[in-house]
Amino acid sequence: MEEHMVTKLKQTDNYFPHFLLLFIVFQPILDLLTSFSIYVLHMSATVGIVVRFAFMLLALGYLLLHHKQQGAKKYILYLCLFGIVLAIGLVNNLMIKSPVSFGEEVKFIMKSVYPIVLLFGYIIALKELKNNEFAFHKIITYFLYATLILSISIIAAMATGTDFPSYPNSKIGSRGWFFAGNDLSSIFAIMFPIVVLYSFHKTTSFSKVYYWIPTVLAMYASIMIGTKVGYGAIVITLGIALFFLFIEYMTHRKKEGKGFTYLVNTIVAAIVLGGLLVLTPQTPIAKNMSIHLQIYEYKKSVQDEKDRKEGKVVKEEEHKQGELTDSEMKSLIYSDRDKFLKVYKQYYKEAPLSQKLFGMGYAGNYTTKMKLVEMDFHDLFFAFGIVGFLMYLLPLLYFGIKIFIRLITNFKKLFSVKHMLLASTLVLSLGIGFMSGHVLTAPAVSIFFVVILAYLIVDLEIE
């Protein structure tokens, strides 16, 4: 009986890394269930939150069970120390912050810690698989399935007229049946390089160009959301893919069989990118940028008029024909997040030393309405303070520096479409997190970043 139990546990342990990878496919399904919970059942605690936090606990349990594996003790020690720092910040805020919501504080901590716990869990799981090629094949396949579910459901929602708009105002865009448009565009942006990688891997001749269909579907769905993030990620990814495909073609063109594959994919990538650039003026993003500037100019004129009536001096910005002013450019790039950032800087300036060190918690020292800056690194800094923020950055800096050194020291070997697209996923994730948020503080998004980071760490033998 005891032997049977041990065998069963070993089997479960062997299957768990596969389950961790398979969980990628369930992400869009959880997001659809979240929408159903909110819009139909009117629940605040959604299925997505409950399942994802349960999954995080499973990943943590898996890490603890494999504490003897190389690096595991280091990860566990870090999580314990980080947990203590977060607990100090939470207790401090419960004592001195008013108003304060215990539930929102804990939820934000859990959401922020989610990618770090999962990162350690995935590193251990991928090491247990002991087959990087198998892991890579599974990852790009599961990313493809998740993207197809997202793309097809958005297109189906739009076709049936049952979709939700991305914006509450006059801007154009559709988020399909999904709840959060910003999260959705971040997911597409982070997954897009992996879908392009899948298309490239499968397209070995012109007769197999149909493998680029998932890429085109993902492009269409992402563009129809109407955000800058989705469009920017597509252009950057296709640009990187085209550049490195051409370089690989030039390198392998004399090798039998290999050169032709790179030529086919270079031509297809060029056509897809060229087609997008030609159609850009007709896309929601182009129309939204124009609408955004009109709204911005109207708000500015109202404010200027108000200031004049109050006797304030209104500074006129230099405005050359066809050029944007600095404030217009900032408004377009940050979607006015920089204004909330000023509010947070004031909160932080007025905060006591304990909050400067251990953070002001969720939404800072707000008075009535809870609102994040929606720029991940800023939100994390203000929420966790100097000590907590540095602790949070530690694994990202540690692994980031190691990956960068490995890429530089093995440049010829790693100078490939595969590694450059994987690296672009990480850069896009952190860039989007910095500029428009909804990556590190959104469990629905951060899992995709974490899986690719964990794969690169194991594949490049960094840990």
Regions found by a protein language model. Give the residues of each.
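Long extracytoplasmic/lumenal interhelical loops at the membrane interface
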Residues: 164, 175, 179, 324-387, ...
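Interfacial loop-to-transmembrane-helix boundary motif in multi-pass membrane proteins
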Residues: 74-82, 122-155
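Aromatic-anchored transmembrane helix interface
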Residues: 48-54, 79-87, 99-127
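Hydrophobic, aromatic-rich transmembrane alpha-helices
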Residues: 2-10, 17-22, 55-68, 191-201, ...
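N-terminal signal-anchor transmembrane segment
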Residues: 2-66, 87-95
